[in-house]
Swiss-Prot record:
Identification of the protein by name: GTPase Era
Sequence segments annotated as region (G4): 125-128
Residues where GTP binds: 16-23, 63-67, 125-128
Family: Belongs to the TRAFAC class TrmE-Era-EngA-EngB-Septin-like GTPase superfamily. Era GTPase family.
Amino acid sequence: MTEENSLRCGYVAIVGRPNVGKSTLLNHILGQKLAITSRKPQTTRHNMLGIKTEGDVQAIYVDTPGLHKQNDKALNRYMNKTASAALKDVDVVIFVVDRMRWTEEDQLVLDRLQYVQGPVLVAVNKADRLEDKVELLPHLQWLAQQLPNAEIVPISALHGHNLDTLERLVAGRLPQGEHFFPEDQITDRSSRFLAAELVREKIMRQLGAELPYQVTVEIEDFKQQGQVLHIHALILVEREGQKKIIIGEKGERIKRIGQEARQGMEVLFDSKVMLNLWVKVKGGWSDDERALHSLGYRDS
């Protein structure tokens, strides 16, 4: 076999309900933090590529928003449409499910998978938390009945358990072909996008259930000056009360958000970062398709 014929390359969609561990799985496969994570469902809002090149194999993972039943706002419709679109024209699908729990939103994903032509791998997450692995068998058997042609792999996205098996199965299902991206490229997203996502992650982690989903981040300025990367980020909310929550008493909360986001950016960009944050009220942005488009929520 020639060197050209030994190359494998393809797209791998990572799908599942919200908050099941898709972004954590991508980060562990890549060996670095790329996709933002939090305990809040629907943290991921956009499809994002995570590219892993290892020898002759280039796997292009597509991290997707969690498919969910809520469809009442333009933002929810955008996320569901984005996740569904990822199932088209990919070479492999990884369906991430919980080790025991099955919900209506898992079923929603399963229903979409009936139309997928390519191979499906079912990654059963948090399997390492069960002391007696026999408890897992009924769930694995049920999953095998639902997806009889799928390979089922118990994993831990957080701790990396059995991910080598999952990656090996992915590699064996990718088509032969030249690599689409340079060996050292790990994503298709810009540095501005990654910076905005880091700020949004810190907001979601700081506020937990205090703040609804109507918050987004826009990078207004991003430039390197000497050894320092200067970033100006605008945090958009829908109501004055939400603005006060983010700022916090005497500005303490937004200060913590800024400190944590800056630290993450310095690791990601390997540069000293000067980060400035502002909070602005933009009423109704999450249910305004034109506003969403202007904020970067565009169809793939």
